[in-house]
Design a protein with these regions (language model features):
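Class I S-adenosyl-L-methionine-dependent methyltransferase catalytic core
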Residues: 1-72, 76-230
Length: 230
């Protein structure tokens, strides 16, 4: 990950480095263009090694204009919100590693619902720490690139039991956290958001409170939404 000159708060996860398997997954499943920029990586990063030739920079990556390149990298998680905003403002192609909790960002959720970006290749990946130890974390790739081929999602051995939302006819499955019903309409989309998420452009069909927690606190709810007609 690059230097955090743009952020005054540094998280421990900012010093985690992506191992080769996750980069190989990106290379295998995404249609990567010829010109790639890895702005959060050094020449020793697995991104620059595997995606070679790829431009890389180790200074403050917020100073650069990435037009003409596809940005493929693992940004410091403490800066990912502003980094994602920068990429969207510049209108460039990108594929960035993001923590699972980033799906709760209202801007990201709306961009996914509009089909402008997608969250793909969810994995429980291993990252290297500066002290030589390793850490596992649930991440996904946030991208506006096309898929090269379909991703065969790992199957879970966990038995999935549906449960009904109180006072509702819609069902949710524990593992997939997806609303299901025989009358499930095309155009209804399940999304995760912070508890008080405002979805002004969408009609909320139903919701589940407190589906996910973060650092022991109940932070996220699950919504079933439909885009409002203008």
């Amino acid at each position: 990950m690059g230097k955090l000159l743009n952020s005054s708060v540094k998280k421990r996860s900012d010093e985690w480095y992506t191992q080769a398997p996750l980069v190989n997954l990106i290379k295998e499943y995404l249609k990567l263009p010829d010109k790639i920029w890895c702005p959060c990586d050094s020449d020793k990063s697995e991104f620059t090694k595997i995606l070679n030739p790829a431009k890389h920079t180790t200074d403050d990556y917020f100073k650069h204009n990435f037009k003409g390149y596809a940005v493929v990298t693992n940004p410091a998680f403490s800066t990912i919100r502003n980094f994602y905003k920068l990429l969207r403002e510049q209108g460039v192609e990108f594929a960035i590693v993001a923590p699972q909790a980033f799906l709760a960002n209202p801007t990201v959720a709306k961009d996914i619902i509009k089909g402008e970006v997608k969250a793909v290749l969810p994995t429980n990946s291993i990252f290297d720490r500066p002290d030589g130890s390793e850490h596992k974390m649930n991440v996904f790739i946030l991208t506006n690139l096309e898929m090269r081929k379909d991703y065969d999602y790992p199957k879970s051995n966990t038995q999935v039991e549906p449960y009904q939302i109180k006072g509702s006819k819609y069902y949710c499955f524990n593992r997939t956290q997806t609303f299901r019903d025989s009358g499930f309409k095309r155009g209804w989309i399940p999304v995760t958001g912070i508890i008080k998420t405002k979805l002004n452009d969408f009609k909320i069909i139903d919701y589940m409170q407190y589906v996910y927690t973060l650092e022991g606190q109940k932070k996220f709810s699950r919504y079933l939404v439909e885009k409002k007609e203008k």
